């Protein structure tokens, strides 16, 4: 029988209820648990309050309550170089990035994992809602968790086998209400603390205002696909494919249908808009993705397979056929049915039933072999 007390687990503690309960459960299971708070961003809010300081106070209270040592580590430099610069580069190129995925890949499960191993940890644990399973060959697979509503495999989709084999997800068989109940019964100070939302380095701040601090906005024309000017945009980086809100456009003599963003022309600095949710320009039958990573290891040869996919968080899976090219780690992904608002810069995540296979970054979308969106 395995003696858990000889297995050291470093838990990434954010000050939130999920990571706190993860630490509590591991402690109850007899592991040698060490809590570590990561500071990735100088996140002083608009009131001049550093929210990281408040979160660390919660970490200290929880760690003291459950009886584990705790530390704080600063990864602001790594975050700035590997995540935030990528975020700015993508927006500057007219794409809509997902920095949370890059943060997991480059900071939480890379720099932080290396730090945990330096503390002689056998495993790193997080408060993510995800599940791992080890097969008879010792290969670790990423699976959907019990709580499908909180499933975070989308954000973990670009991790490698070397990373996930060292990770534990204590919440994998729990729902969020169950986690809160455990926290309340244990008397944890953050049992009712609200979940963090949005991009971690923006927090509750206005997105446009935040982005304009780093990327000067350049306004331009809103045009229809045939070039008619119908309005003015505040900067291409503020809009995403399929967006309806915030365009400031009313009905026309021809139609009362709402307007949607259907493309961007970077050379002309034009935002392309069209009326109607079902605009053909919003529907793709294929996408191209790069940086493909598979949890169980990338195939060494070109391969074709059926799967289901998400190309945005909380989206229902859609059926796809994947053509993977081993040399370039790229893929052509063909949709079983035309897919709406496939957005360059976002993540493609592949599934086979309950298993998350991996994913990559969307480079372009196509309809009848014609590139959409002009980005």
From Swiss-Prot:
It is found in: Cytoplasm. It catalyses: S-sulfanyl-L-cysteinyl-[protein] + uridine(34) in tRNA + AH2 + ATP = 2-thiouridine(34) in tRNA + L-cysteinyl-[protein] + A + AMP + diphosphate + H(+). GO terms for biological process: tRNA wobble position uridine thiolation. The active site is at 103 (nucleophile), 200 (cysteine persulfide intermediate). Its main location: cytoplasm. Transmembrane segments: none annotated. Keywords: ATP-binding, Cytoplasm, Disulfide bond, Nucleotide-binding, RNA-binding, Transferase, tRNA processing, tRNA-binding. Pfam families: tRNA_Me_trans (PF03054), tRNA_Me_trans_C (PF20258), tRNA_Me_trans_M (PF20259). The record marks 128, 346 as: Interaction with tRNA. Its EC number is 2.8.1.13. Residues 150-152, 312-313 are annotated as: Interaction with tRNA. GO terms for molecular function: ATP binding; tRNA binding; tRNA-uridine 2-sulfurtransferase activity. ATP binds at residues 12-19, 38, 127. Disulfide bonds join 103-200. One of its GO terms (cellular component) is cytoplasm. It is an enzyme of class 2 (transferase). Residues 98-100 are annotated as: Interaction with target base in tRNA. Catalyzes the 2-thiolation of uridine at the wobble position (U34) of tRNA, leading to the formation of s(2)U34. NCBIfam families: PRK00143.1, trmU. Belongs to the MnmA/TRMU family. This is tRNA-specific 2-thiouridylase MnmA. It comes from Lactobacillus delbrueckii subsp. bulgaricus (strain ATCC BAA-365 / Lb-18). The gene is mnmA.
């Amino acid at each position: 029988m395995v003696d858990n007390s000889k297995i050291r687990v470093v838990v990434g503690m954010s000050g939130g209820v999920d990571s706190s309960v993860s630490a509590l459960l591991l402690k109850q299971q007899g592991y040698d648990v060490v809590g570590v708070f990561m500071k990735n961003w100088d996140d002083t809010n608009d009131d001049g309050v550093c929210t990281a300081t408040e979160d660390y106070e919660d970490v200290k209270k929880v760690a003291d309550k459950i009886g584990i040592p705790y530390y704080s580590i600063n990864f602001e430099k790594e975050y700035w170089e590997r995540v935030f610069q990528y975020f700015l580069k993508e927006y500057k190129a007219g794409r809509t990035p997902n920095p949370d995925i890059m943060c997991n890949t480059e900071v939480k499960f890379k720099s932080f994992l290396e730090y945990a191993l330096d503390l002689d940890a056998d495993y790193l644990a997080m408060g993510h809602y995800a599940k791992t399973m080890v097969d008879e060959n010792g290969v670790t697979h990423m699976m959907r968790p019990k709580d499908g509503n909180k499933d975070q495999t989308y954000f973990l989709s670009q991790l490698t086998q070397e990373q996930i084999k060292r990770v534990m997800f204590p919440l994998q068989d729990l729902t969020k209400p169950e986690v809160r109940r455990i926290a309340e019964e244990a008397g944890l100070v953050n049992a009712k603390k609200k979940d963090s939302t949005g991009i971690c380095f923006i927090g509750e701040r206005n997105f446009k205002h935040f982005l304009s601090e780093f990327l000067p906005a350049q306004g331009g024309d809103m045009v229809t696909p045939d070039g008619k000017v119908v309005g003015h945009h505040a900067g291409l980086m503020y809009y995403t494919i399929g967006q309806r809100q915030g365009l400031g456009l009313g009905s026309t003599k021809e139609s009362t249908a709402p307007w949607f963003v259907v493309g961007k022309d970077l050379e002309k600095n034009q935002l392309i808009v069209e009326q109607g949710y079902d605009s053909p320009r919003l529907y793709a039958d294929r996408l191209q993705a790069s940086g493909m990573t598979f949890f169980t290891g990338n195939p060494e040869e070109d391969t074709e397979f059926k799967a289901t996919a998400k190309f945005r968080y909380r989206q229902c899976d859609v059926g796809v056929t994947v053509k993977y090219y081993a040399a370039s780690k790229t893929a052509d992904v063909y949709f079983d049915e035309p897919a709406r608002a496939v957005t360059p810069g976002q993540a493609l995540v592949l599934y086979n039933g309950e298993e998350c296979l991996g994913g990559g970054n969307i480079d372009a979308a196509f309809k009848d072999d014609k590139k959409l969106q002009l980005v």
